[in-house]
Amino acid sequence: MANLVLKTDFPDLKLVARGKVRDIYDLGEALLIVTTDRISAFDVIMNEGIPDKGYVLTQISAFWFRQMEDIIPNHIISTEVKDFPAECQKYAADLEGRSMLVKKANPLPAECIVRGYISGSGWKDYKATGSICGIKLPAGLVESDKLEEPIFTPSTKAELGTHDENISFDRMVEMMGKELAGKVRDVTIAIYKRARDIADAKGIIIADTKFEYGIYNGELIIIDECMTPDSSRFWPKDSYKPGGAQPSFDKQFLRDYLETLDWNKTAPAPPLPAEIVKKTGEKYMEALVRLTGKGK
């Protein structure tokens, strides 16, 4: 039975942030991150949720974090509710499968995007300038083409309801120093290349994705989520055909539907038909099953 959690309300716990998708509680020594079933598009949160979406995102993140531990440590302390502090246990039914107990890291002030294929805003940028985020690319590429090498295109972290802004690597160096910026870029590309190969063997193309990092006890760690359908473009390998947009296992399906409406992409969001909610949920669940071999 699909489970829908649009918002958490744990009176005994200290809520410190409610993002587009995640509710974050401060437990003193650690944070509790609960991934709800909220979904946003064009930086607007929809009124309807996608049942079990929070479960899918949490399980996919945990899967990837485990795969990358030798490249970079991550923020997870546990994803098992039984390991969480005593004050969380009464909320176990809402937490099961969709929550993480994590280390309190100091987040870096940039989102780290890596692109292996030309799509989305990257394709628009390339058509206009022949570059993506100032990185010159060969002439004659078509939409959804694979890039010869993945490119690193960081952005600022926007406040809720506003858009991220692409920045140059030089600007990132100014924000965090040359050594740290270089390490973040190298780690981002290394993670992407490994994930690309793992996903490829399971019939999924990861066209692009974004990571967030933090500093914990003086060490660089990966935080937030990791290569989920919310933070990545996942395409089915068996129908990949450069020269246009690709079908996907992510919220591109929802975005495409919204593009057909007479909506100005600002709140309030239009109502979503039950069929769009159902199909979006199926795409998320298929990504989990393909990657991990397990659904719910």
From Swiss-Prot:
InterPro entries noted in UniProt: SAICAR_synt/ADE2_N, SAICAR_synth
Top-level taxon of the source organism: Bacteria
GO annotation terms (biological process): 'de novo' IMP biosynthetic process
UniProt enzyme class: ligase
GO molecular function: ATP binding; phosphoribosylaminoimidazolesuccinocarboxamide synthase activity
Keyword ATP-binding: yes
Catalytic activity: 5-amino-1-(5-phospho-D-ribosyl)imidazole-4-carboxylate + L-aspartate + ATP = (2S)-2-[5-amino-1-(5-phospho-beta-D-ribosyl)imidazole-4-carboxamido]succinate + ADP + phosphate + 2 H(+)
GO cellular component, as recorded: cytoplasm
Pathway as given in its UniProt record: Purine metabolism; IMP biosynthesis via de novo pathway; 5-amino-1-(5-phospho-D-ribosyl)imidazole-4-carboxamide from 5-amino-1-(5-phospho-D-ribosyl)imidazole-4-carboxylate: step 1/2
Pfam families reported for this sequence: SAICAR_synt
Catalytic activity, EC: 6.3.2.6
Keyword annotations: ATP-binding, Ligase, Nucleotide-binding, Purine biosynthesis
Record-linked CDD domains: SAICAR_synt_Sc
Family per record: Belongs to the SAICAR synthetase family.
Name listed for the protein in its UniProt record: Phosphoribosylaminoimidazole-succinocarboxamide synthase
Organism annotation: Geobacter metallireducens (strain ATCC 53774 / DSM 7210 / GS-15)
Gene of this entry: purC
